[in-house]
Amino acid sequence: MSLKVGHMAPDFTLLTDEWKTVKLSDYRGKKNVFLAVYVLAFSEGCTQQMRAVQAGIDSGRIPTEDTAVFGVSLDSPAANAAFAEQNGLHFPLLSDMNHKMLKAYGILKTYSVENEDYQWALRANIVIDKQGIIRLIDEGDNAVDPNTALTLCTTLHKQPSSN
């Protein structure tokens, strides 16, 4: 991953599963941001990861009053909407169909199969504080379980705001 904890999070503008625009910089100074990046809607690991994020919201481990929560994938808004409905997800799922955000964050992998290149998102949980600084990057198979990110969201919630 090219970005590291302590780096400023690159801005992005993406569409939600409800075809609304979300811009990361709109949250700067207002809310922490939890990005749960998943590989492919409806796949087993991604379903498990997104359901665990929803459980974190439902249990209060992600304090949504000061933490914005988003799933992010290469899937279309329509695919994400169907995925959210099927799995009872009540947080926005963002579509990075042009791959710009995932590439900027260094979590886009290219695979070559029979001289054809295919790009996939790498599974990751990323927590960005209110100042726009990356506080956690948890990638790979570990990210199926967002427990580390949930704990950090709770910790950031308890810290006094500097804004």
Task: Tell where the protein language model's regions lie, with residue ranges.
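Chalcogenol-based redox active-site neighborhoods
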Residues: 1-163
